[in-house]
């Protein structure tokens, strides 16, 4: 029952976000979907202009990435990939990069592991406001890449 309703909840939240964005004349609606390929993921991808696929260099991360790429392709949704904590397993990060290259999908960013993220979360402050380090620069570059893709 929860699985069936979770997709409906995502659709309801997305519709409300669209109304708010139109009312406030906002350019973007950013929807953070769950991992996997279940109903909530499909609902969060429905009607999306772009999917930013976040992955980590683990075997399960690679497997989940391959599956969600197939879902995005099925629905015709353009994709960018971001490898989070890419430096915890550079061999798997290279596997992800090679797979994306073979699939014609851009790896838009490789975010390094950084304890400053945990510090920012504990402080309740977005990492881009908490730190001016490498991770903030990478996130800023990723945002620029996303906005260029959407124009």
What is each PLM-predicted segment?
Residues 71-151:
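C-terminal lobe/tail of nucleotide-utilizing enzymes
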Residues 38-59:
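Inter-motif core of Ras-like GTPase G domains
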């Amino acid at each position: 029952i929860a699985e069936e309703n979770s997709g409906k909840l995502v659709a309801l939240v997305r519709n409300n976000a669209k109304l708010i964005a139109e009312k406030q004349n906002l350019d973007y609606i950013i929807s953070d979907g769950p991992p996997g390929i279940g109903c909530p993921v499909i609902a969060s991808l429905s009607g999306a202009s772009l999917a930013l696929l976040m992955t980590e260099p683990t075997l399960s991360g690679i497997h989940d990435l391959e599956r969600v790429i197939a879902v995005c392709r099925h629905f015709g949704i353009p994709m960018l990939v971001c490898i989070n904590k890419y430096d915890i397993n550079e061999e798997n990060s290279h596997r992800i990069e090679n797979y994306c290259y073979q699939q014609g999908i851009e790896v838009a960013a490789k975010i390094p592991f950084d304890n400053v993220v945990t510090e920012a979360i504990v402080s309740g402050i977005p990492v881009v406001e908490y730190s001016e380090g490498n991770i903030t620069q990478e996130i800023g570059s990723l945002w620029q890449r996303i906005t260029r893709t959407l124009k």
